[in-house]
């Protein structure tokens, strides 16, 4: 169970500025619906002063994504665009009191979304250090520049740290070698700088790529589960979530499990609720954490599928 601050809980249970802003003239989208972390930021900017008059968010993600989005909209309202762009993911986490390290990627995505919205308002392409940055993580469409920026901003030093802060690399692990390469390149100048500052001391040693490649093995591998075991774990997660939904006169029912697709049916007050996408996103995130794999939660309005064990 993650250790959430009271402010994170406040912004999750009572999110500020949820929904799209009417008359928005800046829109920033990041993430992927298929991966359960789609985020949209809408801003209403005064064209005379570039001051953000209003901000709203829509998210298909976990509780930390909702809280980070809520916090970001509160932070940017009343700021001009240049000042808003100075907000870092660490500022968002600080505003919330703290975020678990495993959830820092939610604040990183908030910053990405703000950058995208400002670029959209200004009619610009998002500028990077390279004209055609190399794609590091194909599962989440994240490029090398964003990985480098996150490493620098948060002083990261391991592959595990990068996956916790960006949620990239936590799926198929195919991008770990690329992350290792970027880490070794980013850490090398720091070591050389320390060495040059005091030439009388022994040169600082940097982890070689072969040493860095040992880090992915620290990530706990989840044993392959049988279909019955997966269904039981899924039902356990839904049973833990159900009391919260029932307090609001809603409920959730497992309909079917087909590989990485998990079909559920929202009932009662949850049917047609404006927060239904957030509820599904929270369920999906809990299932990902429990199963140790990326799954997709798909809502069904009726139960034409019969669960097969």
UniProtKB/Swiss-Prot annotation:
GO terms for biological process: iron-sulfur cluster assembly; nitrogen fixation. One of its GO terms (molecular function) is 2 iron, 2 sulfur cluster binding. Pfam families: Fer2_BFD, NifU, NifU_N. CDD domains: IscU_like, NifU_Fer2_BFD-like. NCBIfam families: NifU_proper. May be involved in the formation or repair of [Fe-S] clusters present in iron-sulfur proteins. This is Nitrogen fixation protein NifU. It comes from Azotobacter chroococcum mcd 1. The lineage of its organism: Bacteria, Pseudomonadati, Pseudomonadota, Gammaproteobacteria, Pseudomonadales.
